[in-house]
Amino acid sequence: MQSRIALVDRATPAEQIRILAYIFEIDQTGGLLLRHLVEAARRGVPVRLLIDGIGPEPHYPFEDELIVALHEVAPGIELRIFHPRSDLVEISHRMHDKLFLVGDTAVIGSTSIWDASFRNWLSERDLMVSGDAGEEASSLHAMYQHFALFWNSPEVVRPEPEKFLKVASPYRDSQGYATLDPARIHYWREWLLAPLDAEAHATDPAAADTPPASDPLDDPAAAPAPGASFDPAWMPIACERLHYVHDWPDKRSPGTLQDMLQAFDTAQHEIVIINPYLILVPELREALERKQREGVHVILVSASLASITQEFPAVGRAYADDLPGLVNAGIEVREYSDRDNRMMHAKLVLIDGHRYYLGSFNFDSLSARLNTENGLWIDIPKDGLDPLQDSVAYFLRNSSSVSDANGRLLADPDARCRAAGCGGAWRWVTMLIRRFL
């Protein structure tokens, strides 16, 4: 978060701030960033914020009183919501993209704007990219085009806070609210305009780039020391070696799934996939098993069964059900764990030791079929500086294989599920809802 806030604070009126967010919670993390965005907008920086309309739970991202207060104190912030639902029944089509653009710099990766990503609960990976957004061949230009495509799509709606005080709010109907609370609007207005205490938030864990690891020297993404200056270590990479990918708002083909399959086809020696959710759709599983048969070493690093099950037992059950088949196909499956008991949430792919993907794509049916995703492919030249090799090494080092040297599972998946909490009825429930996992 420190890097994002520094970019926002340095932004000038000649630049733009554009944010795609799957989750933007008004907790300590999101609240801190929002107040910095308000300051930027009040000094003339144009800010556009597009948030998925559902989030991790069935609710809209900002309460109406906050939207009204934002409109009053910082009209330069434009807020739109992706695909909100009035009945909250159909919630399968989600904007899972994560993109943070300020001028000629972007932050891309797995991280959402909430405490879970910045307070030592999830292990994330992001990358900062700088270039010429005005150059059509640049990845920065492609990122801005992606944002504009979503911002102007039919799947997006614009709240109209100037009307909220006169009519019932369409964003609160499902919660049974008919009018807004003037006292609540006043609270949010005062909160948004309260002075930011630089010293206070410099030592706040939410202000750090990533959760502090138990061993900062071990984790390449460990947070800098409190109060450290923002000075990224840039690694020059030729424009043609960066390829930005994303889905269309309506999730049409070809999209990120097809891009991933094409990348796997090029693998000659090794594919490493680091992803919290390994519930492979048939196309992905077939591609990986085929590459394994062709002599390509396929390594899958997952979040632990216990952490997946804690989030949603059906997901843990589906993963456990797939383990025997993956291991029998010769694929090396590993599970991440660290001393802080964080859930791995990073999304990385490494092909043949030099071609990386970093982004939002999960290896499950939601990312493959339903959710919109984005990411950056990076082709590292021979003997070139590599910004992600330490991250891949970290996740491999902090994971253990689920099978022995002879390719046999070390523990029975059913027994592991019973211990983790995804046994019993979850076997049958998972069979019914698997295509939505």
PLM segments and residue spans:
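Long, K/E/R/D-enriched contiguous segments that form extended
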Residues: 259, 263-293, 297-314
